[in-house]
Design a protein with these regions (language model features):
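A short SAM/SAH-binding and catalytic strip from SAM-dependent methyltransferases
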Residues: 108-123
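Class I SAM-dependent methyltransferase SAM/SAH-binding core
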Residues: 55-98
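Conserved class I S-adenosyl-L-methionine
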Residues: 1-43, 45-54, 143-168, 225
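A short acidic, Gly/Pro-enriched loop at the edge of an enzyme's catalytic core
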Residues: 97-109
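Short alpha-helix
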Residues: 186-203
Length: 238
């Protein structure tokens, strides 16, 4: 992990040191979309790097599925707490934009719970995606979720009144991305076109996406899903 953490990212990390944050991330359950994707793409014995693993929610459950999992998180408080609760898991303090692992060392990389969206400022996110591509084996997958800027869910007056938008210009919010300052966290909201283009520029290929099941119909859910799960693969011949 680099000695100097950018001030903006350091501010985000402070939000993950509180007792409230520990309580919030203490539910050890998989979401329906995670169950579906994990069943489709993961197999026992495969190696997986769980980035921004928090208190080890997905790390534990993937370990129980038979994967060889290593979890890293920038929050030392989270890792220490998780290590006391789950001493048999491989949990380490680590940054998603400077992963201390060899090239092509994991079959899969996972960033759950929109964890990539807290990489702030944006160059941290770009660096994180490049690092994910670097540590993936050829043919390996990166699965992550990102807040859906185009969701009608976020355009309700009740929801918008709780947000302080940090925009370079207003048009940007309606095109591809916008940073939001909410409950002390700088959070990136994105369009799916932006996510796919940015991740492919990091060296990965788009494979699939999964909407949050709000209604149960993909044609409708895409307009109301507050976040989207994405699947990317590392080319066999870069």
């Amino acid at each position: 992990m680099p000695d100097q953490i950018p001030q903006e990212l350091a501010e985000n990390l402070q939000a993950f040191k509180t007792s409230e944050a520990i309580d919030l991330y203490s539910a050890y359950l998989l979401h329906p979309e995670e169950k579906r994707l994990f069943a489709e793409y993961y197999r026992p014995g495969e190696s997986l790097l769980d980035i921004a693993c928090g208190l080890g929610r997905t790390t534990l459950l993937l370990h129980e599925m038979g994967l060889v999992v290593r979890g890293i998180d920038a929050s030392e408080v989270f890792i220490n707490t998780a290590s006391r609760r789950l001493p048999y898991l491989d949990l380490r303090v680590g940054s998603y934009d400077h992963i201390e692992e060899p090239d092509a060392s994991f079959s899969h990389v996972l960033i759950s719970c929109n964890g990539i969206d807290y990489a702030f400022p944006e160059p941290q996110r770009v660096a994180a995606l490049r690092e994910c591509a670097r540590v993936l084996k050829p043919g390996g997958t990166l699965i992550y979720s990102s807040h859906n800027l185009k969701s009608l869910h976020f355009f309700s007056p009740r929801y918008r009144s709780r947000l302080i938008w940090k925009l370079r210009n207003s048009l940007q919010a309606f095109k591809d991305r916008a940073y939001v300052l909410e409950t002390g966290l700088h959070t990136l909201y994105t369009s799916r076109q932006f996510v796919i283009a940015q991740t492919e520029q990091a060296g990965l290929q788009f494979r699939d996406l999964l909407w949050l099941r709000m209604i149960g119909n993909d044609r409708i859910d895409r307009y109301f899903s507050p976040y989207i799960h994405y699947v990317f693969t590392k080319p066999l011949n870069p």
